[in-house]
Amino acid sequence: MGTSAVILEICLLLSQVLTTVSSTTQTESTTEDRTQITETAFWETQTINSVSESDLPGTHASSFHTEEPLTTIAAEGTEWDLALRLVNGGDRCQGRVEILYQGSWGTVCDDSWDTNDANVVCRQLGCGWAVSAPGSARFGQGLGPILLDDLRCSGHETYLWSCPHSGWKTHNCGHQEDAGVICSGAQRSSTVIPDWWYTTTRSQTAHIRSTIPAWWHPTTTTAARTEWDLALRLVNGGDRCQGRVEVLYQGSWGTVCDDSWDTNDANVVCRQLGCGWAVSAPGSARFGQGSGPILLDDLRCSGHETYLWSCPHSGWNTHNCGHHEDAGVICSDAQRSSTVIPDWWYTTTPSQTAHIRSTIPAWWHPTTTTAARTEWDLALRLVNGGDRCQGRVEVLYQGSWGTVCDDSWDTNDANVVCRQLGCGWAVSAPGSARFGQGSGPILLDDLRCSGHETYLWSCPHSGWNTHNCGHHEDAGVICSDAQRSSTVIPDWWYTTTPSQTWWHPTTTTAASPSSPCGGFLTSASGTFSSPSYPGLYPNNANCVWEIEVNSGYRINLGFNNLQLEVHINCIYDYIEIFDESPGSNTSLGKICNHTSQIFTSSYNRMTVRFRSDGSVQKPGFSAWYNSFPRDASLRLVNSNSSYPSCAGRVEIYQGGRWGTVCDDGWDIQDAQVVCRQLGCGNAVSAPGNAYFGPGSGPITLDDVACSGTESTLWQCRNRGWFSHNCGHSEDAGVICSVPAFTTTPPATNYSCGGFLSQAAGGFNSPFYPGNYPNNANCVWDIEVQNNYRVTVVFRDVQLESGCNFDYIEVFDGPYRSSPLLARVCNGASGSFTSSSNFMSIRFISDVSVTRAGFRANYYSSPSSGSTRLHCLQNHMQASVSTSYLQSLGYSARDLVIPGWEWSYQCQPQITSTQVTFTIPYSSCGTIQRVDNDTITYSNSLRAAVSSGIIKRKKDLNMYVSCRMLQNTWVNTVYIANDTLEVQNVQYGNFDVNISFFTSSSFLYPVRSSPYYVDLNQNLYLQAELLHANASLALFVDTCVASPYPNDFTTLTYDLIRSGCVKDETYQSYSQPSPRIVRFKFSSFHFLSRFPSVYLQCKMVVCRAFDSSSRCRRGCVVRSKRDVGSYQEKVDVVLGPIQLQTLHAEKRSLDQPAVDLEEKASAQGSYDGAAISAGIFLVVVLAVAAFTLGRRGRAADGQPLISKT
C-alpha cells in the first residue's frame, strides 16, 4: 500500500506539471496573438496609404518581434518615412536607438555619441531627459542598415535627424557600435510590464496610471468609446483634422458610406476628435478610397452626439455602398498646408508621440479634454462641466492635476484654454468654483493672457504653486463648442456667445441674432458682422474674430457699413484690427466711425476685436475679408495699334504663372484701380469679352468689385483666387488715360525719380508724353521682396537722337555701385532683368533738344531656388538647396563656414531639402566694412574636395554679403579655374521706429488713429533706429507736408528740407542717443477744402562718430535736379492729421483736448503705437491737424496754409 501510494502521488504530480505546461503554452500563444494584433493595428496607423498591408513591418515575422514589442515606442518626424524608437531596453524609454528611414528600421553609430544626442532622443519620445548615452551595442546589435553616424547635436533640436551628421547611410561603423539611450522616464525594472500597457488589453481594467506621460492623451486623433474596440480617425487628408473618416471596429479599421452624409455628421466627427467644427463634409471618396470594410451607412446625426457611432445608422456592416462613396470631413482646425503628411502623423505632434487607438479608456473623452505642451508633464483639461468644452480648468503639473485661481481671470485667459483644447472661442470665464471645487493643488494665479498665447501656462502668472486663493475661487471656462444641454442659460450668455438668445436693447426679451460674436474664420474670403446686425448690438460685448488663410497669403479687411457710438479717440465702442505676424501682433487701427480704408495684414493671420460699453447702442458693422498671394504682380498685355500703351488684357502673376481676370461685374472703378496701380493715369474704359484677346493661363479673379480707391487690384472684393464661372472669352481689359500732351517743356517745378517697392508698377519721364525738361537727372530705385528679380520693360522711348545726349541707363542694383546692364536710346525697346531684388533706372537729358520721353513698366518674379540669402537686423541667413549641392557632387555636411566648422553657433541646420546657416554679423568670421555711409557684412561658405593627389570635382565657394543701404547679387554663378564660386549679396534694410508723443517729455506715445489735434497744437515726434550696431546714427533730412497721402509733389509745405529748417515752429531736441532723434512742430492744415495733413519724412542713417558724414553736415543747399540715389534714406509717411471736433451728444466725460500732457497724467500711461519702416518703405501712421483760416508763405514758394 505504501509503494502504491507513492506511485499514485508521483503520477498526480506529473499530471499537474503537464497541465501547467499546457496552460502556460496556451497563455503564451494567446499573448503572442494579442501582441501580433496590437502591432498590426499600430503599423496600420503609422504608414502612408500607398503602402499595402502586406508590406507593413508589423505584419512580417521579422526579428523585431523578438525584441520586446511591448516596450518599443516610435516618434515621427516631418518626413513621411522618418520615425524614431528605442528597442530591446526593457521599456519604452531606454534601448537601442533605431530610425525608420525609407521603409526600413536602422541603427545609429556611437561615434561622437553623447548625452546631447541622447537628450534629443528622450525629448522627441517624450521620455524626459537623458540619464545615459551608452554605446558599443549596450542593448544588443541591430540587424538593419546603419543610418546615421557622427551626430553632433546641441541638445535642443526637435528631431534626432535635424542634428548635424555625416549623411544618411554614410558611416564607418559596424553594429557592435550601435548607440543606445537611457532616459529619465525609463522604468527601473525590465521584468515588470508597465502599467500603461494594461489599458491595451481587453481583460484589464482601463485605468490611467500615473506612469502615462502628460502628452499621451491630448495628441491622439483617435477617439474611443466605451467598447474597447471602437475608435475614430481621419486619414489621407494632409493633416489630422481632415481626411477620410475611418472607424476602428472589432480590431479592423473601416470606412463610412456617404449616403445622407452632411455637416451634422461631420460636426460630430470634428468635435469627437477635438478639431473644432465642420467646414465641409465631402463624399465620393474625396480623400481616396479605403480598403477595409464599410462599417456604417445612412448616418443621421443631429450634430450634438458625443460619438459618431451614437448617431442613428443602418447597423454595423450594413450598407449598399462601395468605397467610391467613402465619406470625408474637413474640420475648422485643419492645416492649410499643401504638404502631404502620412496617416501615422495624425496621432502625434512633432516633438511627442502617442501610438494609441483603442487603448484610451472611454471615460477619458466624453467629459475631459487634455492638451499637451512640449514638456512631458504639462497638460490641460476641463472637468465637471458636462462635456469636454466646459468645466473647471485643471492643469497637469509634475504628475498631479491642479486648479487655477480666478484672480484676474477673464475671457482672454479663457480664449487661450478654448483654443488650446480645440473648443472654439471663449463664451464665458466663470470663477467662484462655478463647476465645483477641485481637490488638488492650486497651480496658477493672477494669469494675464493676451488671448493669443498657444498654451495657458505661457501667459504671465505669479509662478507655479504661488497663490493667495482657496478652491472656492477655482476658475472655469465655457467654450463655444460646449454642448447646449444646460437647462438654464445665464444672463451673461446673451451678450457674449452665438447662442439662441440675445439681449434686446430696450427689453429683457431676447432677440435672435443674425451673426455670432466672434469666431475663427478660415475660408479664403468671407463676411462677418456685429451681434444682431443690422439690429442694435448689445452692451458690454467683447467679440474677437480670428482670420487665418493659406500660408503665403495676406488678408484684406474692409467694412460695408460701420455705425458705432462715435468718439474722437474711440474709447467707448470700437473695432480694433491686429496684424498677426510671427512672434507679435501690431494694431493696424482702432475705428469707431465709417471708413473706406482697407486693412491689410503682413502675413496670413489677422484679428478683429469689437467692444461695446454699458450704454449707447448702434446698428454695428458689416465687414468683409479676402486673401491674396504675397507674390502677386499685375500687367497689361496684347494692346493694339489703337492703344499702344497703358491698355490691354489684365493679367495677374501668382505662383509662377500669369492668369486673367473675368469680366463679371467688371466696370470703370475696377479699371481705375488697375490704371493707378500701374502708373497709367485714370481709367478711360473697362472693356470685357476678351477685347484684347483671350488669355491662355488660369482665370485668377472673378466678381471683382472695387470702390475705385484701392491701391492694388487684389485689395478689391472678389470671389476668391482661382474661383470663377468664366471662360477666357470673358477676359477683362482696361484702357487708361495719360496726362495732356505738351510740345514744350513747362517752366514749372517738377519731380522725377523715386523709390518703387510694389511687386509691379510703372514710371515715366517727367511730363510724358509731353516733352521732358532739359538737364534732367532722374533715378528710380526699384526694390522688390527678397529672392525675387526685377524685370523692366520699355514700351515707348522718344529721346533726342544719339546716345551721347539724352539716354536711359539700367543698373543691376543701385546705380552708383552696380554694373550697367544697358544704355537705352531713342527708339529702343525691350526688357531687362536684374540678378537681385534691386534695380536702378537713370534718365539723363542735356541742355538742348527735348522730346516726348519714355514710359516703362516693371514686374517681379522669383529667382532660382538653389541659393537664398536674407539680411536681417542682427544676422544673415543663407540657405542652399541640397539638390543643388548633390548636383555638384557634395552632401549637405560638406558645406561649412571655413575655420568655424566646430563652433556650434556657426553650424547649419540641415533638412532633407536645404542647408541653412544663421550667421551673426558679430561672429563666425563675419567681416564688417564701413564705406560711404554703408555697412557691408561679408562671409563665405565652402565645400572642398578632400585632400589627395588628384581630384575630379571643383571646390565650391559661396560668398555671402549683406550691404545695408546698398545692393545685391543673388545666384550669380561663374567658373574660376578649378573652383565653382557663387556670390550672394542681399540688399538689406535698416528699420526705424517712429511715434507721436503727447508732450516734450516723450513719455507717453499716442495710440489713437487718426490723431485728432487742435489748430496750432504742438506735435512731438520721436524716431529710433532699430539695429544692434551702436556705431550708427539717425538724422532728419527732410519732412514735407501734403494734403494727399501718396502725392508729395503737387501741393506741399516744407518743415525741414536737406537739414534746413523751413517752418518757424519746427524745433529739434537733444538726442538721448545717436540712434534717436526728437523734434516738434505746430499743427496746421491746407486751406479749408483739405481736412487732413500727411507728412513724409526722410531719415538718413550714418556712422555715429564720422565727422564727414551726412548726419554731421546739417543744412545742405543743393540743386533740385542733383537727386543722386536715395539709398541712404529711410522714407516714412505720417498721416492724416485732422482737426479735433467736440461731439455734443456725447456723455459728460468729453472735455476739450487742451492739454494732452494733463490727460496722460490723469490716465496713467498711454499704449505705444510705433510703426517700423524699412529703407524706402512707406508706412502710414495716423496723425491729425486742422485749419480755420489761411496764411501765405509766398516768399518761400510755400503753399497757403493756416495756423491761426
UniProtKB/Swiss-Prot annotation:
Disulfide bonds join 109-173, 122-183, 153-163, 257-321, 270-331, 301-311, 405-469, 418-479, 449-459, 517-543, 570-592, 662-726, 675-736, 706-716, 752-778, 803-825, 1039-1097. It holds the Pfam family SRCR. InterPro entries: CUB_dom, Sperma_CUB_dom_sf, SRCR, SRCR-like_dom_sf, ZP-C, ZP-C_dom, ZP-N, ZP_dom. It comes from Sus scrofa (Pig). CDD domains: CUB. This is Scavenger receptor cysteine-rich domain-containing protein DMBT1. The SRCR domains mediate binding to bacteria. The keyword Transmembrane applies. Its main location: secreted. The gene is DMBT1.
